[in-house]
A protein has these predicted regions:
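Residue-level detector of conserved, function-critical positions
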Residues: 30-390
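Sec-dependent N-terminal signal peptides of Gram-positive bacterial secreted proteins and lipoproteins
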Residues: 4-30
């Protein structure tokens, strides 16, 4: 089971020392003579730092708020909680403290992972040395007993659990709704449906354990019940079926990526080349590219000879192949990468936001989230960077 190590860590950077007493430079400021280094700047006034092999938290003034005594410190920063609590590990055991280092969950677990609002998946070994998983609440009370060999995160009101060698499901009230009986549960939970495996084959069930798609596939690679399709594989080839198990795209491709059934463009791979087919399985763009993305706003990013550009639906090159990576258009701009920096271009290839950002998201509501020199903020369509306030 994935544990707290699922949380993403960024590349370490050295903290900037305060050069003049009283002068507050943007970003994290350290008092003089501090010899700890930055592990991760959250961009909102909290920074994981380390000294030797011990970790703690400082604020943007360089004040230590979580002592540098832990083996690991990772914020419980699931975006919809934002409680400013921290998972900490000491003596090989995990627990939870708040930003004042008050212990909220005693350091007694072998792993700890966010489950749902105010609940955590935790594990501990029994007397025989076997690892058992349970769920505790914010008061450290077990709401699901330690009798499972795997528990996964809650999604759409249900969560996979494993007992012995079989998987079943619990609901958001921690009640068993499907007894453990499946060999495997994929990560694809969609609108009340789950891809599960039995006797070496995959199918799809609903929350009432009714079989929606029979167990006849080697894998279920993607499910989208809203748009009515499922990407599956059979006999080493990939195709698309609908939610009634009717074949939409025959099983003849190495892989299928971006799907847009409504507009008739499906990105597929054949003989290690990317191309596009329509929902009648007719090739609309030849299999000649090294990579391909979904069409957005009339254009798709594709790669050739290691560089990315954009084509239209007639396979005409609109933006030349000169980027290291490319993403879809949003609000008229596309995120592209060049020389390890991110910028944004318009549909003519004109650079609108220069290549000076270390990370970036696509535009939404007139701005895009970006990171620059350890600072996070937004950039607008005029290229103006606005850092987040501490």
């Amino acid at each position: 089971m994935d544990t707290i190590q699922k949380v993403f860590k960024k590349l370490s950077i050295f903290l900037v020392f305060a050069m003049v007493i009283g002068l507050m430079t943007p970003g994290v400021v350290l008092a003089k003579n501090k010899d700890y280094k930055v592990e991760l700047d959250y961009g909102d006034g909290y920074v994981t730092v380390y000294k030797g092999n011990k970790y703690g938290i400082v604020n943007d003034k360089g004040k230590i708020i979580i002592p540098i005594v832990y083996q690991e410190v990772i914020r419980d920063d699931i975006e919809y909680t934002l409680r400013y609590n921290f998972f900490v590990k000491k003596g090989g055991k995990w627990g939870l403290v708040n930003k004042h280092n008050k212990v909220l969950i005693k350091l007694q677990y072998d792993s700890i992972q966010w489950y749902g609002d105010k609940h955590y998946i935790v594990s501990k070994k029994d007397k025989r040395g076997y690892v058992n998983y349970g769920i505790i609440n914010f008061n450290n009370k077990a709401v699901l007993p330690f009798k499972y060999s795997d528990i996964r995160e809650l999604y759409g009101g249900w969560a996979p659990v494993k007992k012995g060698k079989k998987y079943g499901f619990i609901n958001d009230k921690f009640k068993t709704i499907i007894k453990p009986q499946y060999d495997f549960v994929s990560t694809y939970l969609s609108d009340g449906y789950a891809s599960v495996a039995k006797s070496g084959h995959y199918g799809v069930i609903n929350k009432k354990n009714k079989v929606i798609i029979p167990f006849e596939y080697d894998s279920i690679e993607q499910m989208n019940f809203d748009d009515g399709y499922i990407i599956a594989s059979k006999s080493g080839k990939t195709g698309i079926i609908d939610t009634k198990n009717k074949v939409i795209i025959p099983f003849e491709y190495d892989s299928i990526g971006a799907v847009d059934l409504e507009n008739g463009f499906i990105c597929a791979i054949k003989s290690d080349k990317y191309g596009y087919i329509n929902k009648e399985n007719k090739v609309v763009i030849p299999f000649e590219y090294g990579g391909g993305n979904k069409f957005t706003e009339g254009l798709a990013g594709v790669s050739k000879d290691g560089k990315w550009g954009f084509i239209n639906k007639d396979n005409e090159v609109i933006i030349p192949f000169e980027y290291d990576d490319a993403w879809g258009f949003s609000e008229g701009l596309a995120k592209v990468k060049k020389a390890d920096k991110y910028g944004f271009i318009d549909k003519t290839g004109k650079v609108i936001v220069p290549f000076e950002y270390d990370d970036a998201n696509s535009f939404s509501d007139g701005s895009a989230y970006v990171e620059k020199g350890g600072k996070t903020g937004t950039v607008d369509k005029n290229g103006v960077f606005t850092p987040y306030e501490d």
